[in-house]
Every structure is written in structure tokens, then in C-alpha cells.
């Protein structure tokens, strides 16, 4: 059974927490479907080319139908002309969103969490809180403290997951390129797959692993 590594206040390993047995044997295809759904939903769909009805000009016939030796033409907006409309071009009317049901979303999240645990990249801490130093009635060195926490983990990049994130902690991590801090309600399978390691507050971890199949 896969386990999350529990860290103390100095980010040193002090124990482990087991993932529920239902996390075992989940098909990886659920994660594939969720990633496709996530990326397609984020697609802006702004590419647009003009067809022959939308380009300007073309009000008159460019040359006589017969007698010129050239192929007949009715308008310079035809796709065969330079500056004419585009055939089968990009359109912004297409909907790229791919549907996925709640069960597949849950299975994708559980599979991604299981993968992190198997790779020993899932960590649990009691609390993620950056307070900084108060100087002249202002909180300073927030980012420095957050960076020290990240460096102590010795990971390539890290996703931090809080139960109830305060504004100072959010600000502290906002300037770190290799970190992202989110609230537990924002957690999804794509973010779990995108980062090489995950650090969760204990309350957030318990919230995620509780059985939601009966809800």
C-alpha cells in the first residue's frame, strides 16, 4: 500500500500516512482523459480566417465570361485568387471542450495521488504558513522564507496544497517560479501530474482521501 511521507516542522521525515486501499489498481487512462479535458477547456479558440463571403471586394466580375482565353471567374474573393477567402480555414465557432464525468475526475485525481506516493514525492506537513518578519508595521521577507522552505525539500518543483490559505502565505509563494500554492478545493489531477512533488497540509490530505464515492 502506498504511503505519503510525513514531515516535521524542520521538513525532516518523521513517519508516514497510508493512502486508502481504493487508490490501488486505478486505470491510468482516467488521468489521460482528465488532462485532455483540462487542456481543451483552457483552449482560447481565437483562430479565425475569413471565407469568401467575409473578405472585402469582389462586387464585380473580374473579366468577361468568354473570349479572353482565361478560366471563368465570378469574383476576386474566390479562394483561387491572392487575397481571396480561405477554404476550410480556422473558425472560432468550434467547441473544443471534452466532457468528463465526476467519477472519472475522482479516479484521475486518485491515480495521480497514488503515482506521487509510489514515487516518494507526496509529503504531508502539519501546517503551511509563512509569517515573515514585521518591520515598520509591514511584513517582510515573505518570499525569502517561502524559498527556504522550498529549498529544504530538495525537489525540482513543488505543488503546495493548503486547507485554508492565508494571504501572506499566498503572497510568499507567488514570486517563486518552481512553486505553486493552492487551496485544497483547487486541486486537480492535472496539477498533480504537472509537478514533480506535492506537499499537503495534514487537514488537506485528510480532506482529499476521505471516501467521496457515497456523496
Swiss-Prot record:
Belongs to the universal ribosomal protein uL4 family. Residues 56-71 have a biased composition (Gly residues). NCBIfam families: rplD_bact. GO terms for biological process: translation. The keyword Nucleotide-binding does not apply. GO terms for cellular component: ribonucleoprotein complex; ribosome. Pfam families: Ribosomal_L4 (PF00573). Part of the 50S ribosomal subunit. One of the primary rRNA binding proteins, this protein initially binds near the 5'-end of the 23S rRNA. It is important during the early stages of 50S assembly. It makes multiple contacts with different domains of the 23S rRNA in the assembled 50S subunit and ribosome. Forms part of the polypeptide exit tunnel. It comes from the Bacteria. GO terms for molecular function: rRNA binding; structural constituent of ribosome. The gene is rplD. Residues 46-72 are annotated as: Disordered. Keywords: Ribonucleoprotein, Ribosomal protein, RNA-binding, rRNA-binding. This is Large ribosomal subunit protein uL4. InterPro entries: Ribosomal_uL4 (IPR002136), Ribosomal_uL4-like (IPR013005), Ribosomal_uL4_dom_sf (IPR023574). Transmembrane segments: none annotated. The keyword Magnesium does not apply. It comes from Helicobacter pylori (strain G27).
Amino acid at each position: 500500500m502506498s504511503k505519503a511521507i510525513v514531515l516535521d516542522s524542520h521538513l525532516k521525515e518523521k513517519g508516514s500516512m497510508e493512502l486508502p486501499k481504493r487508490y490501488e489498481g486505478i486505470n491510468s487512462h482516467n488521468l489521460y482523459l482528465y488532462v485532455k479535458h483540462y487542456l481543451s477547456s483552457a483552449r482560447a479558440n481565437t483562430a479565425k480566417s475569413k471565407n469568401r463571403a467575409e473578405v472585402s471586394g469582389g462586387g464585380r466580375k473580374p473579366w468577361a465570361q468568354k473570349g479572353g482565353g482565361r478560366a471563368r471567374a465570378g469574383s476576386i474573393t474566390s479562394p483561387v485568387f491572392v487575397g481571396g477567402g480561405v477554404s476550410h480555414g480556422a473558425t472560432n465557432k468550434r467547441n473544443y471542450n471534452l466532457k468528463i464525468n465526476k467519477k472519472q475526475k475522482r479516479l484521475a485525481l486518485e491515480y495521480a495521488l497514488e503515482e506521487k506516493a509510489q514515487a516518494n514525492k507526496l509529503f504531508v506537513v502539519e501546517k503551511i504558513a509563512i509569517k515573515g518578519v514585521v518591520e515598520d508595521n509591514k511584513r517582510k521577507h515573505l518570499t525569502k522564507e517561502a524559498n527556504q522552505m522550498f529549498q529544504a525539500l530538495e525537489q525540482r518543483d513543488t505543488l503546495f496544497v493548503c486547507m485554508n490559505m492565508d494571504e501572506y502565505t499566498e503572497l510568499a509563494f507567488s514570486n517563486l517560479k518552481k512553486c505553486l500554492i493552492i487551496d485544497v478545493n483547487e486541486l486537480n489531477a492535472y496539477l498533480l501530474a504537472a509537478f514533480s512533488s506535492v506537499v499537503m497540509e495534514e487537514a488537506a490530505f485528510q480532506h482529499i482521501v476521505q471516501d467521496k464515492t457515497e456523496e
